[in-house]
Amino acid sequence: MRVVSEFSKDGIRVSVFSWNNKYLLKYELGPMEQTFKIPETDILEESDLDSFYQGEFFDKVVSRFKEMGESFQKQLENL
């Protein structure tokens, strides 16, 4: 597995890996993570991956983290 890049954006850690002819985009926030697998054949240049760190896609990642966090917190309160 090759690390393509790692950085933080808006408090979310973003890691990009190349593995088994796929790019793995991993977003982490606290105890939660979201991972997306993209076939390398769908990406002409690694810079094409930048579209996954901005705009509507990234906004939905952030929104999903909020929803996940609320569900997780409710479940912890029910323990």
Model-derived features: positions:
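Short amphipathic beta-strand/extended segments with alternating polar/hydrophobic composition
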Residues: 33-41
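Mixed-charge, Lys/Arg-enriched low-complexity segments
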Residues: 42-79
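Compositionally biased, low-structure terminal segments
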Residues: 8, 16-18, 37, 53, ...
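N-terminal acidic leader/helix
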Residues: 2-34
